[in-house]
Each structure stands twice: as C-alpha cells, then as structure tokens.
C-alpha cells in the first residue's frame, strides 16, 4: 500500500497553491511514496553504536588560514574617487533609492 495517496498530493498542492494536472498528481504520488520509503529505511537503521562515537562538527582538522596583517600603501581619497561617475562632497554620489514616492 502506498504511504501517500493521490488525494493527499492534491491536498498538499492546494495548500502550496500549485495547479497540478492529473498526470502530475499521479507522478508526484509515486515519487513521494518512493521518498517516504527511503526515509523509512533510513529511520530503521540502528543507532545504538553511535553512542560510542564522539560528536564532531567537522571530520577535518581544518584551521583558519590567514595572512599577516601588514600595513601597506592604499589609495588616497582623490585616487579612489577619480574614476567615479559622480562625486559629491568628497564621496561617491549615487541615485537615492529610499524615501522616494512610488
């Protein structure tokens, strides 16, 4: 017997506001039934031995890789603004997007 019926798929489709054809309802019912079968198999796996295994967040001994924080030359404000299409009061000028009437 199927774990999920065509009517249940139709109900889920209505809840999700999806318009499905009869063929799609039948197809999805079969696909969801197969998925639920796989979930059932996974749920049946014994986890008794897992109590002996320490929990880990990562199986790798990865560490943060960083470069030295060295002070270096950077652009002057004039150099940074030189290629800007518009500048206002020593800043990049961009079109206003907030507070405008629609």
Curated annotation (Swiss-Prot):
It comes from the Bacteria. Pfam families: GatC. Its EC number is 6.3.5.-. Keywords: ATP-binding, Ligase, Nucleotide-binding, Protein biosynthesis. It catalyses: L-glutamyl-tRNA(Gln) + L-glutamine + ATP + H2O = L-glutaminyl-tRNA(Gln) + L-glutamate + ADP + phosphate + H(+); L-aspartyl-tRNA(Asn) + L-glutamine + ATP + H2O = L-asparaginyl-tRNA(Asn) + L-glutamate + ADP + phosphate + 2 H(+). HAMAP family: GatC. This is Aspartyl/glutamyl-tRNA(Asn/Gln) amidotransferase subunit C. It comes from Mycobacteroides abscessus (strain ATCC 19977 / DSM 44196 / CCUG 20993 / CIP 104536 / JCM 13569 / NCTC 13031 / TMC 1543 / L948) (Mycobacterium abscessus). The gene is gatC.
């Amino acid at each position: 017997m199927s774990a999920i019926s065509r009517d249940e798929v139709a109900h889920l489709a209505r809840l999700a506001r999806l318009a499905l054809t009869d063929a799609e309802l039948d197809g999805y019912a079969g696909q969801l039934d197969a998925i639920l079968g796989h979930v059932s198999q996974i749920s049946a796996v014994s986890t008794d031995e897992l109590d002996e295994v320490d929990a880990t967040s990562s199986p790798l001994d990865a560490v943060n890789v960083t470069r030295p924080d060295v002070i270096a030359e950077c652009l002057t404000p004039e150099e940074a603004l030189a290629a800007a299409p518009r500048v206002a009061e020593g800043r990049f000028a961009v079109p206003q997007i907030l507070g405008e009437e629609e």
